[in-house]
């Protein structure tokens, strides 16, 4: 198995290559990642909704040793990535990070969340700092309101 620090750097280079081929190629790749993730998450998210999403990202937090806070209530799941291990590894590299590296998360998470009739709000905060906030809402109107903020 490839070590995660090598994997994220490889991913970064693949993203740059695909972006050079055209935006549609990059988005198609992210959609394929999303389809693959369905095998691990779709039924859990359908059956348990926000609670299932919390369970999934809580497992990821432990498995990937993420400095991440998860907050769940009846209306939304908030994932606050304090230090993203993926972007941290990409930044700790002699190759330049893809400018939109962080967009790959929304690129695979978004289509999956849409399939379970929930709504994603993604705040990258700063593309040069390994942190972001993801909020997943049950109610579309609440997600739209959050995006305005």
Each predicted region: which residue ranges?
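A conserved amphipathic terminal alpha-helix motif
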Residues: 101-113
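Conserved ATPase active-site switch/coordination loops adjacent to the nucleotide-binding site
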Residues: 116
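N-terminal accessory segment detector
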Residues: 1-103, 119-127, 131-133, 138-149
